[in-house]
Design a protein with these regions (language model features):
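Flexible active-site lid/hinge loop adjacent to a nucleotide/diphosphate
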Residues: 133-212
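Nucleotide phosphate-binding/pyrophosphate-handling subdomain across enzymes
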Residues: 55, 152-157, 163-176, 180-184, ...
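N-terminal phosphate/diphosphate-binding loop that engages ATP/GTP or pyrophosphate donors
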Residues: 70-117
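C-terminal helical cap/extension that packs against the catalytic core
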Residues: 213-235, 239-240, 251, 281-282, ...
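Residue-level recognition of phosphate/Mg2+-coordinating polar/acidic sites
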Residues: 66
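Active-site-proximal loop/hinge segments that shape catalytic or ion-binding/gating pockets
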Residues: 402
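Short, flexible loop segments at boundaries between secondary-structure elements
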Residues: 350, 420-427
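Short functional linear segments
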Residues: 1-61, 70, 74-79, 125-128
Length: 427
C-alpha cells in the first residue's frame, strides 16, 4: 500500500485544475488585470490569510529569486523567527514549495490544507473564474502559514510581478528585485525595459531593495517608487548579489550579524549547482535562461571539488531540456561556446508547462555548433542512462536547462519518498 496515496491524489487534483481553459492567465491574457482580480478574489474569499503576519516580503527578478528567498529564510530561522516561505516551482515534489523554518509542509498537512482550500477555489470559480495552478498553490501556502502562526512570510514571485498572484496579497511590507534579464519574453517582454516595468509592479507603499545596476532600468524602478511614495534601496555587491541582497534585507529587519552569517552558511537549495556525485562528477543546476546559464558557465570554469576543477581538460556532457517558448540558441551559447561538449537533448515530464521539442534543440546545435555531438531523447531517463554510459571518470556531467528536468533526475540520488518522509530535500 502506498503511504502517500492521499498526497498523490491531492496533487493530481490540483494539477488537473489546469485543464480548464481560463479567461485569463499570465501566459496569454489579453486583459492581465482580470488575472490579478481573480487572484485577489481568491485570497479575499479565504479571508486574506496572510494579513496576520508581522512582515510580508515578496521577491521578484529574472535570476536569483529562489536563492534570495532561501538565504533570507535561513537567516530569519537562525534568528529564532517563525518564517514561512513559498517557493516556485518545486523540483521533485509539491511539498518543496511550502516551508516553515527547517521543514516542508508534511504530506498529511498538505492534504488537509488542500481540503480547506477546495471550497474557496470552488467559490472563486463560481463567482469569477477557475484560479490558476500558481494561485491555488499560493493560497495553500498562505493557509498553512496562518495555521503555523508565522511571523514572517516570504513569497517568490512566479512570473513578472505587476500581474502575478503574489501581487494580490493584501499588503507587501518589503519588496526585492534581484535583477532584470531576458526570460519569459513572450509574457512580460519583449524588451528589458518592459520586463523591468512588470517587475516594478510589486513596489507599493513599502521599501524595495534591488541589486540591479543598469541605470535605464533603475530609472523605471525610481518612477514606480515616486508614484507609490516608497523607497528604493540599491544594494551594492562584489561577488554574490543574492547573498548581499538577503543580508541587506535582514539588517533592515534588525537581525544580528551572527545570524546573518550562519543563515548564509547553512542556506542551500536543491538543483542549484548541486553536486550529487563526485566521481565521475555530476552536477544538477536548474539554470533556465541566458543569464543563469552564463553564471553556470562561469561557476563551472572557476569551481573546484576536493582540489579538482569542475571542468578539467576533456569533454563536458550536458543533459538539456528547456521550457517553450525560449531562445534556445541564447541559452545554449554560454556552455557550447566555452566547452568541448556532448549534448543529450530531452524534455521534462510535467504536464503544466510546455517543453521544447528535443529535435528543435538538436537542430539549433547542428546549425550553430556543427562540431558538437547531440542526441535526442523523449525520455529524460534514457538520456541520463546514455550520458552515464558515455561518461568517463575524469569527465563532468551537468544536468541543466529546467528545474523540472533536474528535479526528475534528482530522484536517482534522493527519491520523492525520502523527501516526503524527512520533509527535507537533503539527507
Amino acid at each position: 500500500m502506498n503511504p502517500y496515496g492521499n498526497y498523490n491524489q491531492t496533487f493530481e487534483y490540483l494539477s488537473s485544475l489546469a485543464n480548464i481553459r481560463q479567461d485569463a492567465s499570465i501566459t496569454g491574457a489579453k486583459n492581465p488585470k482580470h488575472y490579478l482580480q481573480r487572484a485577489k478574489l481568491l485570497l479575499k474569499l479565504a479571508g486574506n490569510p496572510e494579513k496576520f503576519a508581522k512582515k510580508i516580503i515578496v521577491v521578484t527578478g529574472t535570476s536569483g529569486k529562489g536563492t534570495t528567498c532561501n538565504i533570507l529564510h535561513q537567516i530569519l530561522s537562525q534568528a529564532g523567527k517563525k518564517v514561512g516561505t513559498y517557493f516556485s516551482p518545486h523540483p521533485t515534489t509539491a511539498i518543496e514549495r511550502i516551508k516553515v523554518n527547517e521543514l516542508y509542509i508534511s504530506p498529511n498537512e498538505f492534504v488537509q490544507t488542500v481540503e480547506k482550500a477546495k471550497p474557496i477555489i470552488e467559490k472563486c470559480y463560481q463567482q469569477l473564474d477557475a484560479p490558476s495552478y500558481f494561485e491555488n498553490f499560493l493560497l495553500i501556502a498562505l493557509l498553512y502559514f496562518k495555521q503555523k502562526k508565522c511571523d514572517y512570510i516570504i513569497i517568490e514571485v512566479g512570473c513578472g510581478g505587476r500581474y502575478d498572484a503574489a501581487n494580490a496579497l493584501s499588503r507587501i511590507d518589503l519588496a526585492a528585485i534581484t535583477n532584470i534579464g531576458k526570460d519569459h519574453l513572450h509574457i512580460i517582454g519583449p524588451t528589458q525595459k518592459d520586463i523591468a516595468y512588470e517587475k516594478a509592479g510589486i513596489i507599493h507603499k513599502n521599501i524595495c531593495f534591488t541589486t540591479e545596476r543598469k541605470k535605464q532600468l533603475l530609472k523605471i524602478f525610481q518612477n514606480e517608487t515616486k508614484k507609490t511614495k516608497s523607497n528604493l534601496i540599491k544594494v551594492n555587491f562584489k561577488n554574490n548579489p543574492n547573498q548581499e541582497l538577503a543580508a541587506t534585507i535582514a539588517k533592515h529587519l534588525k537581525i544580528k550579524d551572527q545570524y546573518i552569517e550562519k543563515g548564509i552558511q547553512t542556506a542551500k537549495l536543491p538543483c542549484h549547482f548541486e553536486i550529487v556525485q563526485k566521481k565521475p562528477l555530476i552536477i544538477l543546476d536548474s539554470a533556465h535562461n541566458p543569464d543563469k546559464l552564463k553564471y553556470l558557465t562561469k561557476k563551472l570554469k572557476n569551481s573546484s571539488i576536493e582540489g579538482r576543477l569542475c571542468f578539467p581538460e576533456g569533454k563536458l556532457h550536458i543533459i538539456f531540456a528547456l521550457s517553450a517558448p525560449k531562445d534556445i540558441k541564447a541559452c545554449l551559447k554560454p556552455l557550447l561556446d566555452n566547452f568541448n561538449a556532448q549534448v543529450y537533448a530531452t524534455r521534462f515530464l510535467i504536464e503544466q508547462r510546455n517543453s521544447t521539442d528535443p529535435r528543435k534543440i538538436s537542430s539549433i546545435i547542428k546549425k550553430h555548433w556543427p562540431k558538437v555531438k547531440c542526441q535526442t531523447f523523449l525520455d529524460p531517463w534514457q538520456a541520463f542512462y546514455k550520458a552515464k554510459q558515455n561518461l568517463k571518470s575524469s569527465q563532468t556531467l551537468i544536468i541543466t536547462g529546467s528545474t523540472y528536468l533536474c528535479g526528475e533526475l534528482r530522484k536517482h540520488w534522493i527519491s520523492e519518498e525520502q523527501i516526503l518522509k524527512s520533509r527535507k530535500s537533503f539527507n
